[in-house]
Amino acid sequence: MLENSFQRELLEAGCDEAGRGCLAGSVFAAAVILPPDFYHPLLNDSKQMSEKNRYALREVICKEAVAWAVQEITAERIDEINILHASFEGMSLAVQQLQPQPEFLAIDGNRFYTKLKLPFQCIVKGDGKYANIAAASVLAKTFRDDYMLRLDKEYPMYGWAKNKGYPTREHRLAVREFGLSPYHRKTFNHEIDQLELF
């Protein structure tokens, strides 16, 4: 069972992102403040959940959270400042949208940089430990999946409805055949490994 938050003295927001390892599309970051008594049996790291459960949980989170926000950082911006800084920027911008403003941040991952004057704690695999980070993980993932489904209608040849922009063999082969779309991250390696051809 997940702990609700990392600490209980200060109003805490859990933060996570989705799409960091993708070849195409924006990265999405989310920040969520949950009520202290929030519990849902399905809530866990979004990568461990079925798609159906993720979307069902998104409805619950959006309805029951004290506050939530999702922020998109485009592929163009990722190429400009790099994916790590784009993830940090996305989380910071999501936090700034929260009302009420949190007093503490619980961040999924091993590092974080922000200009926000807020204390924070980085937690490796935090989305499998704390409900507020898991909730942020669900929002970031589902909002990003919706976005990739929209892009897939424009560029069906890359299989984004299925791979969501991640570097699958099929996605890399499509890049080799059709070249890069305007939504591909130009600074990422799109080459297919020779071993993947066999």
Predicted regions and their residues:
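RNase H-like, Mg2+-dependent phosphodiesterase core
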Residues: 1-198
